């Protein structure tokens, strides 16, 4: 059976309503998608890192409960598992504050088993982070050599929009690795200053990857190929 392998950050989200803690749940861009697949019974592995602490235990237990393999999760002894505080307004929109304390050596995990036509998912700032880039490229090269389908979701948020020009070479390299690129109109507005999906595809994506999916909230989905 085809497997899905993802790489990215997982973080414990502590959610506040009316300035009071309401609940705490692990989250993350790639992580959330893999959790949904695990609940459906799809064979899923997640490459990530958490601290050797109580928060790390919570995250790993949550993964196991939702059928995600923890074999490729690095438990670093130095530093602490990342957390975020999510303050919800009356419309349930969140304002985030992040707390991270990673060690110098990161993602100290073996290469996962990948077979032809397995799906390898990568994205968000985690795939662009200079501190992780060399290791990220190792995984991308390996997935491509193993003939996996590489699926890239930039998940490029407004908080990083001011870095778009600086990160452009790495973004384009991620485009080159991808067999499928999927993102929201907001992602590409933050990257290119352009939300028109056809122009984004024609001017920025098609040269690197000809399979392109954009989402528009209530406005639906566009597919280009």
What are these regions (language model features)?
Residues 1-69:
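Glycine-rich phosphate/adenosyl-contacting loop at the front of the ribokinase-like
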Residues 3-5, 118-119, 180, 211:
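Structural motif
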Residues 18, 22, 128-134, 161-164, ...:
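Glycine/threonine-rich flexible loop motifs
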Residues 38, 64, 141-145, 175, ...:
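Anion (oxyanion) recognition and catalysis
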Residues 43-124:
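Conserved N-terminal subdomain of the carbohydrate kinase-like
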Residues 101, 125, 155-159, 186, ...:
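Active-site beta-loop-alpha junctions enriched in small/polar residues
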Residues 146, 160-225:
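Conserved phosphate/ATP/ADP-binding segment of small-molecule kinases
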Residues 147-154:
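Short beta-strand/loop segments at the ligand-binding rim of alpha/beta enzyme cores
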């Amino acid at each position: 059976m085809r497997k899905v392998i993802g790489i990215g950050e997982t973080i414990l989200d502590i959610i506040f309503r009316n300035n009071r803690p309401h609940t705490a749940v692990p989250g993350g861009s790639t992580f959330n998608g893999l959790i949904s697949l695990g609940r459906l019974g799809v064979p899923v592995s997640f490459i990530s890192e958490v601290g050797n602490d109580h928060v790390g235990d919570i995250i790993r237990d949550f993964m196991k409960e939702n059928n995600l393999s923890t074999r490729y999760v690095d438990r670093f002894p130095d530093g602490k598992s990342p957390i975020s505080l999510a303050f919800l307004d009356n419309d349930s929109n969140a304002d985030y504050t992040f707390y991270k304390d990673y060690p110098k050596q990161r993602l100290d995990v073996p290469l996962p088993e990948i077979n032809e036509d397995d799906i390898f998912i990568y994205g968000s700032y985690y795939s662009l982070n200079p501190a992780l880039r060399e290791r990220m490229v190792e995984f991308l090269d390996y997935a491509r050599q193993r003939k996996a389908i590489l699926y890239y979701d930039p998940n490029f948020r407004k908080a990083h929009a001011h870095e778009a020009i600086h990160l452009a070479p790495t973004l384009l390299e991620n485009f080159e690795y991808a067999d499928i690129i999927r993102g929201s109109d907001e992602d590409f507005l933050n990257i290119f200053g352009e939300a028109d999906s056809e122009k984004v595809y024609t001017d920025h994506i098609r040269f690197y990857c000809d399979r392109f999916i954009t989402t528009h909230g209530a406005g639906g989905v566009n597919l280009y190929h």
